[in-house]
Design a protein with these regions (language model features):
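Membrane-interface helix-loop junctions and terminal tails of multi-pass membrane proteins
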Residues: 1-151
Length: 151
């Protein structure tokens, strides 16, 4: 979580002047910090985060536990980067996926604490979704891998 907060502080430093010049769209400012469903539909946001993270957990287990990649961790790391890219491109439209609880929660805390110009609320009513859905989704993905291939 400290990495997510530190990274978000760098984003704030880079975009501060743009936040000052975005008076009519606090939602656009929040989108630089955290995820949220495009239609403000919590069920859709939960399902999207859950499925995307289940896929990530399943594939990560395959990359790091599969016979081919055990000897070549660097290839597995590249594979994870490509999987995350594909998940963001394919399933990221509805929510701008978190895929990780810290990716949403840390920056949302930064948004809530800092006196950012023209910001609105931090949408805490949605904040539980990227935490719970990603955790449960990853557990399901790992469980499906273990059932399918064992460890």
């Amino acid at each position: 979580m400290l990495g997510a907060i530190s990274g978000q502080l760098l984003v704030v430093a880079i975009y501060w002047i743009y936040f000052k010049n975005t008076p009519d769209d606090p939602g656009a400012i929040l989108a630089c910090f955290s995820t949220g469903d495009a239609l403000d539909n919590k069920l859709n946001g939960f399902v999207t985060e859950f499925i995307d993270t289940a896929i990530l957990g399943f594939i990560a287990m395959g990359l790091y536990r599969g016979m081919f990649f055990k000897q070549s961790i660097d290839i597995a790391n590249i594979g994870i980067g490509l999987v995350i890219t594909a998940l963001v491109m394919a399933g990221g439209g509805p929510t701008g996926p978190a895929l990780n609880p810290a990716r949403d929660l840390g920056p949302r805390i930064v948004h809530a604490i800092l006196p950012i110009p023209n910001k609105g609320g931090s949408n805490w009513g949605y904040s539980w979704i990227p935490v719970v859905a990603t955790t449960l989704g990853c557990i399901l993905g790992i469980w499906l891998y273990k059932i399918s291939f064992g460890l």
